[in-house]
Swiss-Prot record:
Protein name in UniProt: Homeobox protein Hox-B6
Name of the coding gene: Hoxb6
General function of this protein: Sequence-specific transcription factor which is part of a developmental regulatory system that provides cells with specific positional identities on the anterior-posterior axis.
Lineage: Eukaryota, Metazoa, Chordata, Craniata, Vertebrata
Modified residues (Phosphoserine): 214
Record PROSITE patterns: ANTENNAPEDIA, HOMEOBOX_1, HOMEOBOX_2
Protein species of origin: Mus musculus (Mouse)
């Protein structure tokens, strides 16, 4: 036994007036913390202490646990919640019928008539000169069969093109662009006009040469 620890069984005698202070000093007989019976513990009385003071009611029981506590009984549920649970169970059991969307042709046609122009409105729409295609006598460049209409030229445009063809049978791209800007035509229109004019010129030259040959032959026959 170590001399540093005081044996609690050994009687301790103190002077008069100091015996009341003895109960307030914790004396230990061994290395374990074992307070005297007069010293109150912070977590309730121990098994060997005096039970003069009752334990507080808010301390948890010694052997109780949170998982072992009995469930609280709140009494029967009100009628409102019981009816609500029954209605939810019935609604969950019944499955809604499948939804089959039907096309609404009348609405589609109505939307087209509202946001788009109908055939009658297109026909009745006035066509102003600035809305027409440049250098075209017809309001539309396509015929009733869907083919592109024949391009017509004014007298001034035809005269200028004939002058240019008289000097040059074939045009360079630079010259073709200049003529197109001067006559307010496209480069493609100038190119097509010259192609057609060359075909016509070849045909006329063939007819002219054939007529000259026939005339020469007629002149040679009487001479024979």
């Amino acid at each position: 036994m170590s001399s540093y620890f005081v044996n609690s069984t050994f009687p301790v005698t103190l002077a008069s007036g100091q015996e009341s202070f003895l109960g307030q000093l914790p004396l230990y007989s061994s290395g374990y913390a074992d307070p005297l019976r007069h010293y109150p513990a912070p977590y309730g009385p121990g098994p060997g202490q005096d039970k003069g003071f009752a334990a507080s009611s808010y301390y948890p029981p010694a052997g109780g646990g949170y998982g072992r506590a009995a469930p609280c009984d709140y009494g029967p549920a009100p009628a409102f919640y019981r009816e609500k649970d029954a209605a939810c169970a019935l609604s969950g059991a019944d499955e809604p019928p499948p939804f089959h969307p039907e096309p609404r042709k009348s609405d589609c046609a109505q939307d087209k008539s509202v946001f788009g122009e109908t055939e009658e409105q297109k026909c009745s729409t006035p066509v102003y000169p600035w809305m027409q295609r440049m250098n075209s006598c017809n309001s539309s460049s396509f015929g009733p069969s869907g083919r592109r209409g024949r391009q017509t030229y004014t007298r001034y445009q035809t005269l200028e093109l004939e002058k240019e063809f008289h000097y040059n049978r074939y045009l360079t791209r630079r010259r073709r662009i200049e003529i197109a800007h001067a006559l307010c035509l496209t480069e493609r229109q100038i190119k097509i006009w010259f192609q057609n004019r060359r075909m016509k010129w070849k045909k006329e030259s063939k007819l002219l040469s054939a007529s000259q040959l026939s005339a020469e032959e007629e002149e040679e026959k009487p001479a024979e």
